[in-house]
């Protein structure tokens, strides 16, 4: 029971306020990514170090490079701080020495968060994925907060294509150790020592793991924090990415600087007032596995919805185009785990998606998957044989919708769990249509007979059992997304193990 509580705390901690860490016409909010901004002291002149490169999006922004030193002057704008660059001749900075910066791109100077090897509260599976990027070599390493032991840390090291993990334990009197015969006052001392000798590790520490997953700023710029409706002339449509019954999706450019995705909606596909009411809620939802809404243009047709750009399109297309040639079970489970992570956040916010499906999950660089279009099902107007229209004018994609939602028009996070089970079917079958050959009416009839999709031929029993849990006829008996996330994170390692330093001591 204790371990469950610790895992629950480790899961919830990232969603608590970040006390532990952490032009232009335009838009709204964006996703904070995997890094939470530090708490800045309101006093003038606090010093910070840049964790990532940032190129100014507006004339008021400040460009900088990873490792640059910055003096923060004002933190009154949420997500955007006024800062001064302390290195006057930084490459590519020109004459701009003061401006606004995204707060989740910096950490307080000389803090643990500022160290290139510290990755914060990422999970074991994510540590492995990042270390296994081809850009990293043997000896690449990172230190992260322990998932199971609050206040402790874990060391993850790449050794000839295999990631090994070590518990960094604390001394009662302060300090850290792997083995008690060698202790350290600080983590910096720990890292400095093991970069000179392996001494119990599988390999000597070399370069820190590259931080390839760059967080997304909270908004397009500091001026757009409180703006919602933007001038459509600030948006350029560059390349059509796809089309559907609601309209088209384009790759676009905001303010001649920032790549975005733009949904252009067919006239009459939604009521602008209904959408804006829903959008006020949607824009406040921030999580690394959710597509964050940036802005809208609703004053004339076509309505524009501006979001973060995910260059590989929908998960449905991604799966269908691959057809199993490269994607294997490990990546399929990772897809499902990332979606479950985003949905667990919506669950924690008491928010319901209503249209969870592979077509509404987007694929980015480095195998990143994010949930999109949450909440939009309430405002779209559709006419399709596979859509169930209730007497209350709620439209349902029948093949993804829970029986009780079809029957009573009552949605809950548990009806989203049912849809997640259908999404798992799409993932494991490389994007096949569920209930292939059946009409929406036939599906409704079969569900009434307690029919469930059969186990696909290439689907492991363990994966199918998770699907079946999602399709429990009793909504209350379906797992939470929090539980689904844990199950998928631990799919290949139900008993997480750490390497023993004694195995490597000569």
UniProtKB/Swiss-Prot annotation:
It is an enzyme of class 2 (transferase). Highly expressed in stomach, small intestine and colon. Concentrated in the brush border membranes of epithelial cells, throughout the maturation axis of the adult small intestine. SUPFAM superfamilies: Protein kinase-like (PK-like) (SSF56112), SH2 domain (SSF55550), SH3-domain (SSF50044). It comes from the Eukaryota. PROSITE patterns: PROTEIN_KINASE_ATP, PROTEIN_KINASE_DOM, PROTEIN_KINASE_TYR, SH2, SH3. ATP binds at residues 241-249, 263. The modification Phosphotyrosine is found at residue 388. GO terms for biological process: cell differentiation; cell surface receptor protein tyrosine kinase signaling pathway; negative regulation of transcription by RNA polymerase II. The modification Phosphothreonine is found at residue 179. Its main location: cytoplasm. InterPro entries: Kinase-like_dom_sf, Non-receptor_tyrosine_kinases, Prot_kinase_dom, Protein_kinase_ATP_BS, Ser-Thr/Tyr_kinase_cat_dom, SH2, SH2_dom_sf, SH2_Frk. Belongs to the protein kinase superfamily. Tyr protein kinase family. SRC subfamily. Non-receptor tyrosine-protein kinase that negatively regulates cell proliferation. Positively regulates PTEN protein stability through phosphorylation of PTEN on 'Tyr-336', which in turn prevents its ubiquitination and degradation, possibly by reducing its binding to NEDD4. May function as a tumor suppressor. This is Tyrosine-protein kinase FRK. It comes from Rattus norvegicus (Rat).
């Amino acid at each position: 029971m204790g371990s469950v509580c610790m895992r629950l705390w480790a899961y919830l901690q990232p969603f608590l306020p970040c006390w532990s860490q952490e032009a232009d016409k335009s838009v709204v909010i964006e996703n904070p990514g995997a890094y939470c901004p530090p708490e800045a002291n309101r006093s003038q002149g606090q010093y910070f170090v840049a964790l990532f490169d940032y190129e100014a999006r507006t004339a008021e922004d400040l460009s900088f490079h990873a490792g640059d030193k910055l003096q923060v002057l004002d933190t009154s704008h949420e997500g955007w701080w006024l800062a001064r660059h302390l290195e006057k001749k930084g490459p590519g900075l020109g004459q701009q020495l003061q401006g606004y910066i995204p707060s989740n791109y910096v950490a307080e100077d000389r803090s643990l968060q500022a160290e290139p090897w510290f990755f914060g509260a990422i999970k074991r599976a994510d540590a492995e994925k990042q270390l296994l990027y081809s850009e990293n070599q043997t000896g690449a390493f990172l230190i992260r907060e322990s998932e199971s032991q609050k206040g402790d840390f874990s060391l993850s090291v790449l050794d000839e294509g295999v990631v090994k993990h070590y518990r960094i334990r604390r001394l009662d009197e302060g300090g850290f150790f792997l083995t008690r015969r060698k202790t350290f006052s600080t983590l910096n001392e720990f890292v400095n020592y093991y970069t000179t000798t392996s001494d119990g590790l599988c390999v000597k520490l070399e370069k820190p793991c590259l931080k390839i997953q760059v967080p997304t700023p909270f908004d397009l710029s500091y001026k757009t924090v409180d703006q919602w409706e933007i001038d459509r002339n600030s948006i350029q449509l560059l390349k059509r990415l796809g089309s559907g019954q609601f309209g088209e999706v384009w790759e676009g450019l905001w303010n001649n600087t920032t790549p975005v995705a733009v949904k252009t909606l067919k006239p009459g596909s939604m009521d602008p007032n209904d959408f804006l009411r829903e959008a006020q809620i949607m824009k406040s939802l921030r999580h690394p596995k959710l597509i964050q809404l940036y802005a809208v243009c609703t004053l004339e047709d076509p309505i524009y919805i501006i979001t973060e750009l995910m260059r590989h399109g929908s998960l449905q297309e991604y799966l269908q185009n691959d057809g199993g040639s490269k994607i294997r079970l490990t990546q399929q489970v990772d897809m499902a785990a990332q979606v479950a992570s985003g949905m667990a956040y919506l669950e924690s916010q008491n928010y319901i998606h209503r249209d969870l499906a592979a077509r509404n999950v987007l694929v980015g660089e480095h195998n990143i998957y994010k949930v999109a279009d949450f909440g939009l099902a309430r405002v779209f107007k559709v006419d399709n044989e596979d859509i169930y229209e209730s007497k209350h004018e709620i439209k349902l994609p029948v093949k993804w919708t829970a029986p009780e939602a079809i029957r009573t028009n009552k949605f809950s996070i548990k009806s989203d769990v049912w849809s997640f089970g259908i999404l798992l079917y799409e993932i494991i079958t490389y994007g096949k249509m569920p209930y292939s050959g059946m009409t929406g009416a036939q599906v409704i009839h079969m569900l009434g007979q307690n029919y469930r999709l059969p186990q696909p031929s290439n689907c492991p029993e363990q994966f199918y059992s998770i699907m079946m849990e999602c399709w429990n006829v009793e909504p209350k008996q379906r797992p939470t997304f929090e539980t689904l996330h844990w199950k998928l994170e631990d799919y290949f390692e139900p008993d997480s193990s750490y390497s023993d330093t004694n195995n490597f001591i000569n």
